[in-house]
Curated annotation (Swiss-Prot):
Stated role: Catalyzes the alpha,gamma-elimination of L-methionine to produce methanethiol, 2-oxobutanoate and ammonia; methanethiol (methyl mercaptan) is considered to be one of the main causes of the oral malodor associated with periodontitis. Also displays homocysteine desulfhydrase activity, degrading homocysteine to produce hydrogen sulfide, 2-oxobutanoate and ammonia. L-cysteine and S-methyl-L-cysteine are poor substrates for the enzyme.
Swiss-Prot/TrEMBL keywords: Antibiotic resistance, Lyase, Pyridoxal phosphate
Protein name (database record): L-methionine gamma-lyase
NCBIfam families xrefs: met_gam_lyase (TIGR01328), PRK06234.1 (NF004876)
Amino acid sequence: METKKYGLGTTAIHAGTLKNLYGTLAMPIYQTSTFIFDSAEQGGRRFALEEAGYIYTRLGNPTTTVLENKIAALEEGEAAVATSSGMGAISSTLWTVLKAGDHVVTDKTLYGCTFALMCHGLTRFGIEVTFVDTSNLDEVKNAMKKNTRVVYLETPANPNLKIVDLEALSKLAHTNPNTLVIVDNTFATPYMQKPLKLGADIVVHSVTKYINGHGDVIAGLVITNKELADQIRFIGLKDMTGAVLGPQDAYYIIRGMKTFEIRMERHCKNAKKVVEFLNKHPKIERVYYPGLETHPGHEIAKKQMKDFGAMISFELKGGFEAGKTLLNNLKLCSLAVSLGDTETLIQHPASMTHSPYTKEEREAAGITDGLVRLSVGLENVEDIIADLEQGLEKI
């Protein structure tokens, strides 16, 4: 399929499909650990990479290949590598491109496990990590060194949905020809933003979220050029992490991607109406959403994103107790971590995900006592708003 001729929705449905023996419409699940060779000579050629074909599911599987082809087409990259989680994608990538003595510049605002990998994981193996605000190009410029191998960031970032100018950042980072720009595009997805087209070298995803969209799979994906993808597959994934995605999970994601575009349209449409409600509510101090003109990254988001997404953070005036009260009185919204599901998910970081931390530690990470994170789902938006309204009345 010539994906460039088609729209995003068509690409998500049709890209990367492989013909199979029986001509099935749905992609078969090739539930096998290993593959049979016609001869010893063929086995030798495949291990020597002289002949295309499958060897062992840790190295590749037809069902997983279809998923990889689809996301590569959506992100407009040359190739992709599927992993068993978003952290598997991030770890497999970093363990491929980094070595002792290298330097990483990354953002202060990161997904918690990514932050832990940067702060406690990489540094154990002789890799230096500098944390900056990547939306401030002067900070990035001042942090970079001759041995800076990676600039890593999320945009929009968690929890305040900070926006980074990817085109400007990539241009700055590439003044060092050895530096790779890696972007976690989980929040935006290729529906809204394509970092490779804006100058990034590698894109990573937690496919658990919007791309699968149904809350029933843990998976990750890496998208980049063919050379780097091969290195990540045969070094970082095969030898370092072993974070291989199984064909059953790959099938679920392929199925989920068939509704990717229409789901994202509904997510974004619902979120705008929820933001409008929250922004006017007297018990809310502040709403973080890149679609608001008051958001510091609004103009950049308009420039590099097709839409503003379905993630919202807001601060309650009543602080810690107000956050708990709101969540404990909701009837429709689900109290759960993660995001990008059909259901609306809500969490209060101070009393949930970040409860082991002190107040000072939370605030250093941008998490105030009254901060609430909302992943707007696909329910009728009037029902989402009504549930939030009745919950807020209890504060």
